[in-house]
């Protein structure tokens, strides 16, 4: 599994809801840490899909690391 953080600057609630629904469909766990950061937990292929998906919002996925 991989853990990562998504930076969600200047997002509306609809943007977060769209990312959340994508995660739910692809078996990715996502947690809102605060107004800017979201923590995600996913298998490597799904994390890659998420990275491609959030790029369309001009968002970034950073600090990806292995989780035991």
List the predicted regions and their residue ranges:
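Short glycine-/aliphatic-rich beta-strand segments at the starts of folded cytosolic domains
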Residues: 1-11, 38
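Amphipathic, interaction-prone secondary-structure segments
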Residues: 10, 15-18
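Short, flexible coil/linker elements and helix-boundary hinge sites characteristic
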Residues: 6, 10, 24-27, 58-59
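Conserved short beta-strand edge segments in small beta-sheet-based binding/regulatory domains
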Residues: 29-33, 56-68
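Acidic, low-complexity, intrinsically disordered interaction modules
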Residues: 17-54
């Amino acid at each position: 599994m991989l853990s990562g953080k998504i930076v969600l600057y200047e997002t509306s609630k609809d943007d977060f809801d769209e990312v959340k629904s994508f995660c739910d469909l692809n078996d990715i766990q996502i947690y809102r840490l605060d107004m800017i950061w979201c923590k995600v937990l996913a298998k490597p292929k799904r994390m890659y899909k998420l990275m491609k998906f959030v790029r369309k919002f001009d968002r970034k996925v950073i600090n990806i690391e292995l989780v035991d």
